């Protein structure tokens, strides 16, 4: 549904990559529309995220720590939340930063949202801006949490 879309996948299992390529060809998708990227250093892995437009979270097992990396790099992510903890991790992260509109609860809405985002560069840019600004705030959050905890502990000790 998105003519110029390219899917970017991790290539770290030769047999899985072979099977994926077979399935891609079987479904009539040109192989040049799929990029298989090898594992790389963490800095390069994070730099690659600047080249993507949107991250498609997996289901039923969400991205977990990868989702955190994606959001910290300013890459918008679409997720499909389910009923289990592992299917709600990415949704929880998106909710915590005020991006509930990127959380879907069925396959049709997930696909439609991805297609809509692919056609709306301004909306994607707005999400990137929100994520980058929010990252600056999240960087300060641990120190604020520690100060709050210190205050609470001091008050508890003084109350003894």
Language model features by range: what are they?
Residues 31, 58-139:
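Catalytic binding pocket for nucleotide-activated donors in carbohydrate/polymer assembly enzymes
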Residues 1-4, 10-23, 35, 40, ...:
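C-terminal amphipathic helix plus adjacent low-complexity
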Residues 4-8, 35, 53-54, 76-77, ...:
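Beta-sheet entry/capping signal
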Residues 50-60:
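Acidic donor-binding loop of glycosyltransferase active sites
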Residues 23-29:
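Short helix-loop-beta junction
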